[in-house]
Amino acid sequence: MKKLITPFLLVGALASCENATAPDLYTNYINDGEAHPLVILVGGSDGGNYFANPNMKPLMDRYHDYGFSVASMGYFDTSGTPDSPIELSLNEIDARIKAITEDSSIKGQCVALLGFSKGAELSLLLGSHFNTVNHIVAAYPSHVVWNAVKTPMSYSSWSIDGQPLPYIEAPLLSFDMLSGIFTGEYRNAFTDALSEASPKELNDAAIPVEKIKGSVTLVSARQDQIWPSFEMANKIEQRLSDNSYENPVLHIDLDGDHYSYNKETMDTVLTHLKRVMGSECN
């Protein structure tokens, strides 16, 4: 067991060292003296600010082609965010986003939050529980809250008003999680956790996406090897439909894996966002 755990801890330690040097917030705004709509990016389970890497600037510049300013933020393990990924305060993350939207160069009612993987879970939660952001894009999303990453202990990933959110647990030290270190396949750990959860546990952990105030865009992968994003995106769609959700909903299901989001996908997402935001944002 020790031989299996050690590489996992080493990977986590190396990721932490890299993230600690990343800024909490990176901005790439259109600098023409006018206010523009904004897309805020949040990354996956490393919690850092992946999009702040200078190598990502050409990609970030593409948002300008669609009239969007763009920012990216870390939510743990950067210099000014919590070190631990346990019970992260959604209130604090929302307050940080609100401060970003109050910049005079941003149209405050024209903000989209685009999260990837664990960041998609976060984005859906923020849209469901707060009114700061009115358009949510969730790439490789989850319909439920999961346990905290990077810890073998059982904790919720998120909290609101100091209270941890109910969650489904995919144990870090399960066979499927540990073998994934070598195979890159973690999907079974999550599908097993979902199938073994009781109806009450699933209901309690479900993200109340019907409370989102604006458009919902989902991007999933049919061959997702990390977790079942296609099936979970379908659950989100079904919940929205069951609650007679009236805002625009788009589900882009990719014929690929967890890393198949490419420039064409990005163009589709931004074209859709520009349309659903309406003339007041463009």
What are these regions, as identified by a protein language model?
Residues 105-117:
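Alpha/beta-hydrolase fold nucleophile elbow
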Residues 32-62:
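Short, surface-exposed "cap/lid" segments of acyl-processing enzymes
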Residues 23-35, 104, 276:
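Short beta-strand-to-loop junctions in surface cap/lid or active-site-entrance loops
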